[in-house]
UniProtKB/Swiss-Prot annotation:
<feature type="domain" description="HTH gntR-type">
    <location>
        <begin position="1"/>
        <end position="69"/>
    </location>
</feature>
<dbReference type="InterPro" id="IPR036390">
    <property type="entry name" value="WH_DNA-bd_sf"/>
</dbReference>
<dbReference type="InterPro" id="IPR050679">
    <property type="entry name" value="Bact_HTH_transcr_reg"/>
</dbReference>
<keyword id="KW-0804">Transcription</keyword>
<dbReference type="Pfam" id="PF00392">
    <property type="entry name" value="GntR"/>
</dbReference>
<protein>
    <recommendedName>
        <fullName>Uncharacterized HTH-type transcriptional regulator YydK</fullName>
    </recommendedName>
</protein>
<dbReference type="GO" id="GO:0003700">
    <property type="term" value="F:DNA-binding transcription factor activity"/>
</dbReference>
<dbReference type="Pfam" id="PF07702">
    <property type="entry name" value="UTRA"/>
</dbReference>
<dbReference type="InterPro" id="IPR028978">
    <property type="entry name" value="Chorismate_lyase_/UTRA_dom_sf"/>
</dbReference>
<dbReference type="InterPro" id="IPR011663">
    <property type="entry name" value="UTRA"/>
</dbReference>
<dbReference type="GO" id="GO:0045892">
    <property type="term" value="P:negative regulation of DNA-templated transcription"/>
</dbReference>
<feature type="DNA-binding region" description="H-T-H motif">
    <location>
        <begin position="29"/>
        <end position="48"/>
    </location>
</feature>
<dbReference type="InterPro" id="IPR036388">
    <property type="entry name" value="WH-like_DNA-bd_sf"/>
</dbReference>
<keyword id="KW-0805">Transcription regulation</keyword>
<dbReference type="InterPro" id="IPR000524">
    <property type="entry name" value="Tscrpt_reg_HTH_GntR"/>
</dbReference>
<dbReference type="GO" id="GO:0003677">
    <property type="term" value="F:DNA binding"/>
</dbReference>
<keyword id="KW-0238">DNA-binding</keyword>
Length: 236
């Protein structure tokens, strides 16, 4: 995790622990620079990250203010860190269906920008929230980047392992959303009937150097999944 990201996390934790509400004012820029012993540019990047996440808003000449917290149980479509943190107040578990090393499908190779002869980790799992099915997930990880996975890792947060275990820096993602109907396989794993509605998300996650490392296809249980996009000047 880069320094500005670490500071952003600490500021966000401070907001949560002190139960700050929308409109509460945070320390001024100079105070934050002194507190964290970093340059103005680093603090500015931290605040920009928090603003993009919807945690704060800045008013020129007035200061830095807390923004209204998003509702509990909603998954942010703007997060690059996986959705485990969005659901930290809930019991999120995973059931691993498949985990192996194989060659990519043409679709995975294209989205990961790799050759058909390169190895990938293929992961198929079902995610649960408080014991109820949340989503059915198929993921392809470039093995030359994500060098090791096992059942224990895949049963928990893969992104936490990628950041903390492998020391990789996750940069940005591209998400493609579709509304459709569950096929037989998806319905079976989600405990629903085929033909019921689903939100289907294809995601491509990249490192900070722009290299894609994860291509995932996720079908969400419409009864259990809720999403949020907190728009700001970066999106409008």
């Amino acid at each position: 995790m880069l320094k500005y990201q670490q500071i952003a996390t600490e500021i966000e934790t401070y907001i949560e622990e002190h139960q700050l509400q929308q409109g509460d004012k945070l320390p001024v820029l100079e105070t934050l620079m002194a507190q964290f012993e970093v340059s103005k540019s680093t603090i500015t990047k931290s605040l920009e990250l928090l603003e993009q996440k919807g945690a704060i808003f800045q008013v020129r000449g007035s200061g830095i203010f807390v923004r209204k917290h998003k509702r509990k149980g909603y998954i942010s479509l703007l997060s690059n860190q996986g959705f485990k943190k969005d659901l930290e107040d809930f019991n999120v578990t995973s059931k691993v269906i498949e985990l192996d090393v194989r060659k990519p499908t043409p679709e995975a190779a294209e989205n990961l920008n790799i050759g058909m002869d390169e190895d990938i980790y293929y992961v198929k799992r079902v995610r649960y929230i408080n014991g109820q099915t949340l989503c059915y997930e198929e993921s392809y990880y470039t093995k030359s980047i994500v060098t090791y996975l096992n059942n224990e890792i895949v049963s928990h947060s893969i992104f936490h392992y990628i950041r903390e275990g492998l020391g990789l820096k996750i940069g940005f993602s591209d998400l493609f959303l579709h509304v459709g109907q569950l096929n037989e396989e998806e319905a079976e794993y989600l405990g629903l009937e085929a033909g019921l509605p689903k939100l289907y998300i294809e995601s491509i996650f990249h490192l900070t150097n722009g290299q894609p490392f994860d291509y995932s296809k996720i079908s969400y249980n419409y009864e259990q999944s809720q999403f949020v996009v907190q728009a700001n000047s970066f999106l409008l």
